[in-house]
Amino acid sequence: MRQRVMIAMALQCNPSLLIADEPTTALDVTIQAQILDLMMELKDKRKEAAILLITHDLAVVAETCDRVIVMYGGEIQEIATIDELFKNPLHPYTKALMDSIPKMDTKEKRLKALKGMVPSLLNMGDGCKLCSRFDPKDCACGGTGEEPELYEVKPNHFVRCNPSIFD
């Protein structure tokens, strides 16, 4: 109820940008659908309005977003259209996120997870932020330990990876 009231109050101001930080967390699916419908109503009625949705829920992303920015450790790791990201995730972290989604068509009981724990943003240091979570050969830096640059791999699809990992 509180989320709906807050969104309704925000929409009364006719914003050109609605920032929604985890708007559906800890909600049952019925209320979650109502919240998402409310936000999509804003998007449909006001063509010049935009919604910045901050979430870890890839199902919500798939249902509501046009473009996606995947972040880790406060850094952009991948940017793509929703279709491109779900069809062709390129960054190892994005692939790991996709692999952590339960699949209905397999008998696999155990979900895949990254090794280790998420490090504190205060203790990440310089260099590649993902080295502690991936084996060197699978890491975005290609095992160099250096923070890769964000580059465009195809029109409107950007990834922060050492190009050598695609060889």
PLM features per residue range, with description:
Residues 18-21:
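Catalytic Walker B motif of ABC-type/P-loop ATPase nucleotide-binding domains
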Residues 23, 27, 31-109:
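P-loop NTP-binding/switch modules centered on Walker-like glycine-rich loops
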Residues 81-167:
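Short catalytic/signature loops enriched in Gly
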